[in-house]
Amino acid sequence: MAAEDVVATGADPSELEGGGLLHEIFTSPLNLLLLGLCIFLLYKIVRGDQPGASGDNDDDEPPPLPRLKRRDFTPAELRRFDGVQDPRILMAINGKVFDVTKGRKFYGPEGPYGVFAGRDASRGLATFCLDKEALKDEYDDLSDLTPAQQETLSDWDSQFTFKYHHVGKLLKEGEEPTVYSDDEEPKDETARKNE
């Protein structure tokens, strides 16, 4: 009677006898391959990019530099922080100076944005121009940027503020640097003299 039920339902007798899903997975090479791929991807997701987990240093990156104390820079002082003269890489955006050393692959000498290292990158980022000619050697007040370019620059400023350490500001010629205390709160030079 059981054989008649199988014939009546149209089911394959081997499916009813075996392990069902497990039988399907382990008897098909394609399913085995997909299962292996799923396990590998799950392992990569769970394990993630744990630093030092593999025991080797893939990129031969130098050890991280200590955090730079907050200070202000003239365009000439900023220029030496290009990743060549000094291992640290600084960039100015919208009057703010950021330590972008951890982004060496992008902003280092061989990176796609290496032209901005040690410079005020505001004009280049606002105009989407990676030419060295777009950058000025002296302080750039950016007064000739269009509203759309100013908005683009503001977006870059927000991204850098979120991602990189803000180490100070870019000084105009003749501007006095801000004195920063150990807790990195700015104090004007005149307020400091009155104490």
Curated annotation (Swiss-Prot):
Modified-residue entries (Phosphoserine), positions: 54, 181
Keywords, in A-Z order: Endoplasmic reticulum, Glycoprotein, Iron, Lipid-binding, Membrane, Metal-binding, Microsome, Mitochondrion, Mitochondrion outer membrane, Phosphoprotein, Proteoglycan, Receptor, Secreted, Steroid-binding, Transmembrane, Transmembrane helix
Membrane topology: Single-pass membrane protein
Glycoprotein keyword on record: yes
Gene null: resulting phenotype: Double conditional knockout for PGRMC1 and PGRMC2 from female reproductive tissues results in postimplantation embryonic death leading to subfertility, with female mice producing fewer pups/litter than wild-types. They undergo premature reproductive senescence, producing fewer litters overall during the trial compared with wild-types.
Binding site for heme: 113
Pfam families per record: Cyt-b5
Extent of the signal sequence: none
Modified residues (Phosphothreonine): 74, 190
Residue ranges that the UniProt entry lists as topological domain Cytoplasmic: 44-195
Domain (Cytochrome b5 heme-binding): residue spans on this chain: 72-171
Any Gene Ontology biological process: heme biosynthetic process
GO CC annotations on file: endoplasmic reticulum membrane; extracellular region; mitochondrial outer membrane; neuron projection; neuronal cell body; synapse
Lumenal side: 1-24
Superkingdom, natural source: Eukaryota
TM spans (from-to): 25-43
Subunit text: Homodimer. Forms stable homodimer through hydrophobic heme-heme stacking interactions. Interacts with PGRMC2. Interacts with FECH; the interaction results in decreased FECH activity. Interacts with EGFR, CYP1A1 and CYP3A4; the interactions require PGRMC1 homodimerization. Interacts with TMEM97 and LDLR; the interaction increases LDL internalization.
Family of this protein: Belongs to the cytochrome b5 family. MAPR subfamily.
Domain notes: The cytochrome b5 heme-binding domain lacks the conserved iron-binding His residues at positions 107 and 131.
Function: Component of a progesterone-binding protein complex. Binds progesterone. Has many reported cellular functions (heme homeostasis, interaction with CYPs). Required for the maintenance of uterine histoarchitecture and normal female reproductive lifespan. Intracellular heme chaperone. Regulates heme synthesis via interactions with FECH and acts as a heme donor for at least some hemoproteins. Forms a ternary complex with TMEM97 receptor and low density lipid receptor/LDLR, which increases LDLR-mediated LDL lipoprotein internalization.
Designated name of the protein: Membrane-associated progesterone receptor component 1
Organism this protein belongs to: Mus musculus (Mouse)
Gene that produces this protein: Pgrmc1
